[in-house]
């Protein structure tokens, strides 16, 4: 039986509040300013692609410019408030909100300038790429 049909507690239970943070990277490999991530659980599923969830911590004033991901993902706001930018519009996201973003769909995420605390979101995606992978997102050069 393959590994993705088994449960391994040390690998399949991860605390995204206490695990170590990692720098998140631009597609060219440079660290994103003011943004870190905490890896959560991930596993290869039947289709051979990886599923996973990570915590992203955005310091006040930081932003992800317009970008896409290879797969669809769901964002869950854990703390504070921010905005998701879709089709030229900023939509506010507050604690408890869940947002679905289709695969290859251009979007941006930024903090709320009126909120002086870190904006924390849970990003759950398929396929999943490691939090510190420079291939996690592709920047969109035009809107």
Where are these regions (language model features)?
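Short, conserved beta-strand element in jelly-roll/cupin
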Residues: 57-59, 68-84, 124-126
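Short acidic-glycine-tyrosine-enriched beta hairpin
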Residues: 88-104
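Short histidine-centered beta-strand/loop micro-motifs
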Residues: 43-45, 63-69, 110-112
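Ligand-binding loop in jelly-roll beta-barrel domains
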Residues: 103-131
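Conserved short histidine dyad/triad with adjacent acidic residue
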Residues: 39, 52-69
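A short, N-terminal "cap"/entry segment at the start of jelly-roll beta-barrel domains
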Residues: 1-50, 136-143
């Amino acid at each position: 039986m393959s590994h993705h049909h088994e449960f391994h507690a040390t690998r399949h239970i991860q605390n995204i509040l206490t695990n170590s943070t990692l720098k998140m990277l631009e597609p060219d490999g440079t660290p994103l300013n003011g943004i870190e991530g905490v890896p959560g659980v991930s596993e290869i599923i039947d289709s051979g692609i990886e599923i996973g969830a990570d915590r992203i911590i955005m310091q006040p004033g930081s932003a992800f410019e317009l970008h896409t991901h290879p797969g669809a993902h769901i964002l869950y706001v854990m703390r504070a408030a921010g905005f998701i930018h879709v089709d030229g519009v900023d939509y506010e996201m507050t604690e408890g909100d869940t947002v679905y973003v289709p695969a290859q769909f251009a979007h941006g995420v930024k903090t709320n300038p009126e909120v002086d605390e870190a904006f924390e979101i849970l990003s759950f995606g398929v396929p999943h790429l490691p939090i510190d992978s420079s291939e996690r997102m592709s920047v969109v050069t035009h809107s």
